[in-house]
Amino acid sequence: MSKPTIYIAAGHGGNDPGAVSGKYIEKALTLKTALACQNYLRNYECETVMARTTDKSCTVAYKMEEVEKKRPSLVLEIHYNAGGGEGCEVYYWHTHAPSKSLAQKVLAEMVKLGQKSRGIKESKAGTSYNFGMCRQAATTGIPSILGEYAFVDNAKDQAKINSDAKLRAVGEAYAKAAVSYLGLKKKAVEPAKPSGGGSAGAIAVGSTVKVSGAKYATGQTLSLI
């Protein structure tokens, strides 16, 4: 049985910087967040597909085509906001209930980081929120959301994204929502293999060992039976 696949899309890229306010450049913020999301998911029984892993151009049309071709289990489109507001919001296609459920989980994880909630919002045709990556859910049936964690031009929000550690936490929030939505299990941890072919913790007969205490001299060869 194939593993669930999560498509992670960092918004903008290349010659499209997205929202910019001083040192806060959306394309860079989204990439760091997306990579952190992928890294967290490496611990779970799933596959990830990245729209981009470097600062390259990545159009909405390209991402929609990739989703259509690869048929992932869900889509996480990562963005940051601008325009003077404050807080986080998550968009979903207004007629797609599974996407709404995913949006609720993503928003809940964002709020756990201490961010102000602006709620989940509908993406629909005929509005300025007609997002392609949300819209494709209606044709593919794949749960898809577009998240906006913070406003790059708001001082309070800037304080929540001003370090790699904080961006990593945002990426992990997206990942945790995906884990919850898909019911993913952690990968089994393989026990470490002992070096030299022996059993872990075993001492070969005739080995020279150091023993603390008065009974044996340090470095003395012991006869082990």
Residue ranges and their predicted role:
Residues K3-I6, Y24, A28-K193:
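Active-site-proximal helix/loop segments of hydrolytic enzymes
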Residues S21, E190, K210-S212:
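N-terminal non-cleavable signal-anchor helices
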Residues G196-I225:
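Beta-loop motif signature
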Residues H12, A150-F151, K215:
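A broadly conserved detector of short glycine/acidic/proline-rich loop/turn motifs that flank catalytic sites
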Residues K3-K23:
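Short glycine-rich His-centered loop
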Residues D16-A19, A155, A217-T221:
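Short, solvent-exposed loop/turn elements at domain surfaces
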Residues K3-I6, A10, I142, A169, ...:
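A residue-level detector for conformationally permissive "hinge/kink" positions
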